[in-house]
Amino acid sequence: MTKMSKGPRSGSRRVMTKSVKNKGMPKVNEMMKTFEVGDRAAIVINSAVPDGMPHHDFQGITGVITGMQGSCYILSFKVGNVEKKVIAAPVHLRKVQ
């Protein structure tokens, strides 16, 4: 038998697929988005950009921007009673009202 892969993208076939009209690299504006501390944002992974990509388990999670680390943003949210922080590039985040 073969061994199961254990890479960071394993088990993410449905999460990281893009529709035909959205394939390819994102626009420059998408990569240069800015957020303020306190803004609400959702994690929407763009599979064309591997830099600053959060783990695919966090796809669709909504949280609050709490700061920056380099050119990436720190997104805080709760899972049950546990406070979690994810570092993600702006291309993988979408503003939420």
UniProtKB/Swiss-Prot annotation:
Pfam families: Ribosomal_L21e (PF01157). GO terms for biological process: translation. One of its GO terms (molecular function) is structural constituent of ribosome. InterPro entries: Ribosomal_eL21, Ribosomal_eL21_arc, Ribosomal_eL21_sf, Translation_prot_SH3-like_sf. The keyword Lyase does not apply. Residues 1-23 are annotated as: Disordered. Gene3D superfamilies: Ribosomal protein L21 (2.30.30.70). NCBIfam families: PRK04306.1 (NF003303). Belongs to the eukaryotic ribosomal protein eL21 family. This is Large ribosomal subunit protein eL21. It comes from Picrophilus torridus (strain ATCC 700027 / DSM 9790 / JCM 10055 / NBRC 100828 / KAW 2/3). The gene is rpl21e.
